[in-house]
Amino acid sequence: MNQERLNEIEKPLLHLVERDVVPALGCTEPISLALAAATAAKYLGKTPERIEAKVSPNLMKNGLGVAVPGTGMVGLPIAAAIGALGGDPEGELEVLKHITPEQVSQAKAMLDNKLVNVDIHQTEHILYSEAVLFADNDRVKVAIQDQHTNIILIEKNGEVVFEKEQDECADCDPYDIFKQVSAREIFEFSCEVELDKIRFIGQAAALNSALSNEGLRENYGLHIGRTLRKQVGSGLMSDDLLSKIMIETTAASDARMGGATLPAMSNSGSGNQGIAATMPVVVVADYLNVSEEKRLRALFLSHLMAIYIHSKLPKLSALCAVTTASMGSCAGIAYLLTGKFETVSMGICSMIGDISGIICDGASNSCAMKVSTSVASGYKSVLMAMDETHVTGNEGIVEHDLDRTIDNLCSIASKSMHHIDCQVIEIMVSKPCP
């Protein structure tokens, strides 16, 4: 890549990674509602007596069955209650970082007394959360839309305190840069950008490794990571690099989905996507004992490639986005093992031929299953590419060009899978109570 082109794309690409790779405590969909409630509580100025919340169907899907960190409970009602009673309105995706046991008890009491209600709000916006808090004769409403922390409305007693213009940033979509760059340029940029400008990505390894260690220390969620490690000890699984990738990555997801009070470094608004883009690269880099520079460039490539692919998808969809985030770590591993774009291209094409169509049926402990499947596919696909074999453009939705293959996958997710999404949500909200 020539210096002029590097300079042209450097600022927007760095901005995107800094914007989309951020710490998040807890699954980001219920956290978005918690942030709306915390902000409403700030403007209410007193302890709320009742909470009425509304969320988009996709946010409901991702909030029904997932643990809310620090509470020992799952679901959107507890997220709204603890956000209102103990959330930090300035904390963004770490809104619940400083909650106390007393506040958790108060939040649970609100639920027991049926003072918190969460309904589906039919809206054209895939990501939408709204919290309305009541106390005495006061009422505060806060709405978040399109991005997990994008507050668009604050209203108190019917008067608008803050309202973001809907077209405020219509002409400055930060993802527009991806209309001008290719996957090859993503690779070349990651290899050539000044190292000091991407050192911040090392924090992703630190945060998600800590989460992985926590997931191996205690039984969280389905404790898949611990189970696989146990079976390595019993001899039923090999103690090899693939097993290490699956165990350490899945353990981080176990802890995250099981309610651990440690932040994940997220990607594209998702902690699991951040984990899938980080941990396989960390494990392989440690195994190879590579230099700090190579490690950082591999991590940066992984996260940027994951953002690049996810930018072509709806913010929330019926396609499990851990699969696309794992395509990022596939690129990072390919860089570590060969340093060649051709390996990256063959690897991602094979992944698309392998795990396309895994559905998102809501955030839950079972997300860790999809994480283990996706990262295993990524490593397998790199090994195939190193042996000059891959799913070719003669097969299925894969084409001879990586960017066209990515576009095909994302087109299916954006169009055809919309009907799947509706049916998944219908099934989830109509299940009988156990």
Language-model regions, residue ranges each:
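Flexible, glycine/charged-enriched surface loops at secondary-structure junctions
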Residues: 47-51, 91-96, 118-119, 195-201, ...
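Glycine/charged-rich beta-loop-alpha catalytic/anionic-binding loops adjacent to active sites
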Residues: 13-23, 58-66, 255-266, 306-316, ...
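Acidic-glycine-rich active-site phosphate/pyrophosphate-binding loop
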Residues: 2-14, 45-59, 240-259, 291-309, ...
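Conserved phosphate/anionic-ligand binding catalytic regions in large, soluble enzymes, centered on
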Residues: 23-39, 262-279, 320-324
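A structural signal for small-residue-enriched, beta-sheet-centric alpha/beta enzyme cores
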Residues: 4-5, 25-28, 58-62, 145-162, ...
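Early transmembrane hairpin of solute transport permeases
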Residues: 34-130
